[in-house]
């Protein structure tokens, strides 16, 4: 039986025994749209093991169908999602949603991401470089590495280690009013993901 894409992605990104994940949902809106003062789709699921995330899937799918975007914190936090609560850096990441194709191709060729997440369209990508459990990178070092990717086309606003990015396996609901709800998907690159899954 195949696993849910969200579980496959999270396990490939961080297969450590101690791994936990922070999942957040909120109403998915286009940039600049007015946000609800009290968002009925805002949910925070802190310190979730992979098994607990599996148990959350039905609730996440229901929230997604109601118009929520499904996001996760790229690194491990203890409690509330904020930079000072990041307890373990598990990856270097970059948001290439606004990059041009030549920039994306150059990063693929030179840096070989462990995982590519395709958020919508042909040039909307998030790249991850999973770290081995033996690596010990602190928050300032990780953020410096993330910022270095800005020169290659990454979003400068998405370099913090407590960043929320879209979780594969769920629909991108930002433009549902235009009947555009692409599935967020992940592919595993030539670099070895942390969990050793290609």
Question: What is the predicted function of each stretch?
Answer:
Residues 72-110, 131-198:
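DNA replication initiation modules
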Residues 116-128, 165:
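Short, conserved phosphate-binding/catalytic loop or strand-edge motifs used
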Residues 43-60, 118-120, 140-152:
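A signal for specific C-terminal beta-sheet/loop modules enriched in small/flexible residues
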Residues 1-91, 163, 171, 190-197:
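DNA replication initiation on ssDNA origins
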Residues 111-115:
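Surface-exposed loop/edge segments in extracytoplasmic proteins
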């Amino acid at each position: 039986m195949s696993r849910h894409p969200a579980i496959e992605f999270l396990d490939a990104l961080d297969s450590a025994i101690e791994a936990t994940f922070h999942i957040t949902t909120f109403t998915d809106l286009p940039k600049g749209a007015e946000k609800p003062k009290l968002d009925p789709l805002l949910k925070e699921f802190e310190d979730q093991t992979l098994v607990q995330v599996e148990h959350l899937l039905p609730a996440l799918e229901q929230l997604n169908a109601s118009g929520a975007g499904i996001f996760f914190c790229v690194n491990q936090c203890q409690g509330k999602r904020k930079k000072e609560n990041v307890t373990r850096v598990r990856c270097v990441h970059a948001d290439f949603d606004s990059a041009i194709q030549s920039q994306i191709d150059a990063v693929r060729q030179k840096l070989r991401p462990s995982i590519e997440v395709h958020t919508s369209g042909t040039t909307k990508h998030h790249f991850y470089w999973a770290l081995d459990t033996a690596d010990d990178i602190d928050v300032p070092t990780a953020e410096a590495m993330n910022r270095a990717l800005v020169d290659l086309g990454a979003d400068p606003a998405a370099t913090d280690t407590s960043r929320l990015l879209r979780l594969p396996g769920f629909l991108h609901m930002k433009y549902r009013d235009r009947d555009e709800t692409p599935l967020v998907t992940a592919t595993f690159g030539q670099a070895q993901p942390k969990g050793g899954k290609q």
